[in-house]
From Swiss-Prot:
One of the record's GO cellular component terms: plasma membrane
Main location: membrane
Membrane topology: Peripheral membrane protein
Family statement: Belongs to the UPF0161 family.
Protein name as annotated: Putative membrane protein insertion efficiency factor
Location of the protein in the cell: Cell inner membrane
Length: 69
């Protein structure tokens, strides 16, 4: 299940993200964070961490360096 989710994020990175303007306020980007979280913590916890990260990626959050715990 985790590998399938990583493939979906990679698809987004390769085919969808290049046509959108850059908007991630964090380093690593939210999609790269999602891949790292899925690989490190598995499908359930990794998805939860990625979901929380995407919610933090907004104009009211300062952003910056935010590695996977």
């Amino acid at each position: 299940m985790g590998r399938l989710l990583v493939l979906l994020v990679r698809f987004y990175q390769l085919f969808i993200s290049p046509v959108l303007p850059p908007s991630c306020r964090h380093s690593p980007t939210c999609s790269q964070y999602a891949i790292e979280a899925l690989q490190k913590h598995g499908a359930i916890k990794g998805s939860w961490l990625a979901f929380r990260r995407v919610l933090r990626c907004n104009p009211w959050h300062p952003g910056g360096y935010d590695p996977v715990p």
